[in-house]
Every structure is written in structure tokens, then in C-alpha cells.
């Protein structure tokens, strides 16, 4: 079988896959911070809060993209391990066209239910104009956003991690260029920020389409290949829906946290919005290194190379925990200075710095959860994937939030995620220990 991965140099191959993913996501962090910076320069708390309230909308669109992006790439990686090139073409084409259709349907539904959804997000009379402007553009651009997460996942599973990074960086650079023009110079505020985001995604989508059409050896977007078997559909949805649940739970987390912060004022929601964006520095580095292992985990599982997989799992866990501890220390020690880059109000700086520290205290536990979640997704383990998808930012978080708020009031809102991280990491390690066919010796 003609392997697409160099398994003789396992760690080098892992970093070859992971580093472009990390770099691409770090550019995404730069964009998010730039976006936040330009919005925060308005010194308009209602504007900052209004845009922050719409964060779950973006996460929800990501979730729908990941149903077919992560679900499809997980299956494709295993098919590549089995040297089934015909199957990879069919699955990739199916995922592309179903995702496009999903994006169009979502756009229509989001516009139809715009007002009630904005109410659920927590928009008030003060923040509604800004939230509605941002939300409307995101809704119209839903197909472009959903497709972007399909493309970036699919090209990585064929080993084109660098090309995936180029696509992500290209769209983000366009986004960053447009931000100051549309937000400040043209004066479109929240709507301008959203337009910049969607235009960036459109440009990235066009690049990925060209890449799949001209450069891919195994993937396809030909309509004639848009069909899968019942078993393949079950595998795509089994992994993809659990991956999407993780994103949807993240949206629910933000909504619930904002609802609990609402009695304390819009300044608390605005500060949390900024702190969450800054904490993404650590989170997305961990996501990048975790996602870098997906093609390898899926390939090794499909090729039944269990000893090599166990070696890679041990290495990745050690590496991720180490880098998480370092990033956590850096962000904690510089929390005030980082908040000061975005706002000058002393009260908001102090509030945001405390929020940021709580967001990253347990980054090492988050790294363990991320890696084991993608491991279960890559190997098609639906039940463990499902349990982890609804734990850290779902059921476990909501329980932690209710209990912590009851015991510590405002401080409980801030510490809930840290408590959920510790409990969910314990669950993840327990599930790994129970997954004999992944960790068993050959």
C-alpha cells in the first residue's frame, strides 16, 4: 500500500501535520484579537457587548460545518488507511454538497427567526441594534462559513496541512485588512466586522475549491460522485454530530454564562467577550496540535497499526500538557497587560484580567480533553465522542455553573469552566482506559 504518511519518522510527521494547523489557527487568533481591538476602540460598551452576544451564532455555524467536515475527514482518513481511493472521492463530494445545502437552509431559518433568536442570545434594547447588524450578515453568509469548515478539514486528512494553513491565513489576512476599513473608516460598526468575516471566508472557500479540483489525489467535488452507502452515512453522522455537539455546547456555554453575567451589567459581558478572545491564544494552540493528530490517528487505526498509535498518543498527551502549562502561566502573569491592549477603563481591565485567569487556569486539563476527543472522532468511536462532546462545555459545565453560582455568586460564574475542565478530563482518561481496541498491544 502506498502510504501518504512517513511513519518511520512518526513525531516529525505529526508536527508536519500539526504545525500548519497551529499557525493557521494562530492567524485566526490574530484576526479575532484585531476584530476585538477595532470594535473596542469605539469605547462603546453596548457595541462590544452586542458583538460578543453573537459569538454563539458563529460557533453554531462551525458546528454544522463540522458535522460533515470532521465526520467526513474521520471516515476519509480511515479509508486512506485501507487504500480505498474511490471511497474517499465519494465521501468528500457528498460532504461538500450536503454542507452547501445545509448552509443555505440555515441562512433562511436564521433570517426567519432573527428576532426571537437575538432575544435568546441575551440582546437588550441597548445592545439590540449592534447585535442585529452583526447577526444579519452572519446569517446571510452562513453557506460560506459552513463550507469553510468542510474544506479545511477535508484537505488536512489527505496530508495537505500546509495548504490548509494557506487557505485559512489568506482568508484571515483579507479579513484583517477589511476590518478597520469597514468598522471605522466606513462607519459600519458591528455590521462591517461581520462583512469582513464573510468576505474572508468566501475568498478562502474559492482557494480550497481550486485546491480540491487541481491538486488533490484522493478528494473530489464532482457532483457525479456525490453518493455514499448507508454505513458510510452512519459513520459520517456518528462522528460528525458528536463533533457538532461540542461546538453547540460551546454556544450554549457562552449564552448561559452571559445570562448569568447579565444582572451584573453589560460591562461584565463586554469584559468576558474580550477575555474569551484573548484566552483563545492558548485554546487554539491546543486545538491545532490536537487536530494535527486526526489524520494520523485515523490512518493508523484504519491500517491496524496499534503499537504506533499508542506511541503517538503517549507523546501527544505529554506534549500537550506541557505546552498548556507554559501558555497558562504566560497568560496569567500578563492578564492585566493583555486586557489593557483593548480597553483603558481600569474597572474593565481588572474585571477582564480576573476572567482571563480563570479561563486558562486549567488549560492542561482542556488539552487532555481535546486530544482524546479528536482521538475518538478519528477512530470512529461514537459513544466516547458523544460523552466528551456534551461534558466539558455542556452538561458538566452547566452543572458546575449552577452549583458554583449558588455557592460563590459572581465568582462562581468565573470558576465554573475550570471545575468543568477537571471533571471532564477525568472522564476522558477513564474512557481512554476503557477503549481496549485503541490502546491494546498488537
Model-derived regions: residue spans:
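N-terminal transmembrane alpha-helices
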Residues: 6-37, 41-43, 56-71, 75, ...
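Residue-level signal for transmembrane alpha-helical positions in Major Facilitator Superfamily
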Residues: 15, 30-31, 68, 109-113, ...
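Transmembrane helical elements of multi-pass membrane transporters/channels
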Residues: 16-35, 137, 171, 200-204, ...
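Helix-terminus/linker motif at the lipid-water interface of multi-pass membrane proteins
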Residues: 26, 30-49, 118-125, 181-188, ...
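Small-residue-rich hydrophobic transmembrane alpha-helices
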Residues: 48-108, 145-164, 271-329, 333-335, ...
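Hydrophobic transmembrane alpha-helices of multi-pass small-molecule transporters
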Residues: 60, 175-180, 205-209, 281-284, ...
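Short runs within selected transmembrane alpha-helices of multi-pass transporters and secretion channels
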Residues: 69, 137-156, 164-172, 193-206, ...
Amino acid at each position: 500500500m502506498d502510504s501518504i504518511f512517513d511513519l518511520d519518522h512518526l513525531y516529525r510527521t505529526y508536527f508536519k501535520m500539526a504545525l500548519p494547523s497551529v499557525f493557521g489557527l494562530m492567524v485566526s487568533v490574530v484576526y479575532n484579537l484585531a476584530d476585538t481591538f477595532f470594535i473596542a476602540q469605539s469605547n462603546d460598551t453596548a457595541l462590544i457587548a452586542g458583538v460578543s452576544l453573537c459569538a454563539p451564532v458563529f460557533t453554531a455555524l462551525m458546528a454544522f460545518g463540522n458535522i460533515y467536515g470532521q465526520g467526513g475527514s474521520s471516515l476519509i482518513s480511515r479509508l486512506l488507511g485501507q487504500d480505498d481511493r474511490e471511497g474517499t472521492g465519494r465521501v468528500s463530494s457528498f460532504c461538500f454538497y450536503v454542507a452547501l445545502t445545509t448552509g443555505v437552509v440555515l441562512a433562511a431559518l436564521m433570517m426567519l427567526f432573527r428576532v426571537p433568536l437575538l432575544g435568546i442570545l441575551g440582546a437588550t434594547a441597548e445592545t439590540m441594534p449592534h447585535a442585529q447588524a452583526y447577526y444579519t450578515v452572519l446569517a446571510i453568509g452562513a453557506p460560506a462559513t459552513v463550507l469553510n469548515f468542510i474544506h479545511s478539514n477535508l484537505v488536512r486528512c489527505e496530508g495537505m496541512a500546509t495548504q490548509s494553513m494557506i487557505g485559512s491565513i489568506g482568508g484571515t489576512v483579507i479579513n484583517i485588512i477589511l476590518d478597520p476599513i469597514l468598522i471605522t473608516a466606513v462607519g459600519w460598526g458591528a455590521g462591517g466586522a461581520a462583512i469582513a468575516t464573510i468576505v474572508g471566508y468566501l475568498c478562502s472557500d474559492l482557494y480550497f475549491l481550486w485546491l480540491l479540483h487541481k491538486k488533490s489525489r484522493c478528494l473530489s467535488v464532482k457532483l457525479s460522485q456525490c453518493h455514499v452507502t448507508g454505513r458510510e452515512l452512519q459513520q459520517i453522522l456518528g462522528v460528525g454530530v458528536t463533533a457538532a455537539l461540542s461546538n453547540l455546547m460551546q454556544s450554549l456555554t457562552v449564552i448561559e454564562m452571559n445570562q448569568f453575567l447579565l444582572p451584573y451589567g453589560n460591562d461584565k459581558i463586554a469584559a468576558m467577550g474580550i477575555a474569551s478572545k484573548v484566552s483563545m491564544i492558548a485554546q487554539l494552540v491546543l486545538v491545532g496540535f490536537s487536530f494535527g493528530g486526526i489524520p494520523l490517528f485515523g490512518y493508523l487505526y484504519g491500517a491496524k497499526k496499534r503499537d504506533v498509535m499508542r506511541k503517538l498518543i503517549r507523546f501527544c498527551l505529554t506534549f500537550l500538557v506541557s505546552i498548556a502549562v507554559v501558555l497558562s502561566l504566560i497568560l496569567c502573569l500578563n492578564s492585566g497587560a493583555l486586557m489593557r491592549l483593548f480597553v483603558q477603563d481600569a474597572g474593565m481591565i481588572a474585571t477582564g484580567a480576573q476572567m482571563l485567569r480563570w479561563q486558562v487556569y486549567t488549560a492542561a486539563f482542556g488539552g487532555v480533553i481535546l486530544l482524546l476527543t479528536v482521538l475518538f472522532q478519528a477512530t470512529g468511536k461514537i459513544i466516547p465522542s458523544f460523552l466528551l462532546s456534551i461534558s466539558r462545555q455542556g452538561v458538566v459545565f452547566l452543572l458546575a455553573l449552577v452549583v458554583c453560582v449558588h455557592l460563590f455568586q459572581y465568582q462562581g460564574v468565573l470558576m465554573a469552566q475550570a471545575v468543568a475542565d477537571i471533571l471532564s478530563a477525568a472522564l476522558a482518561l477513564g474512557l481512554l482506559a476503557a477503549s481496549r481496541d485503541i490502546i491494546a498491544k498488537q
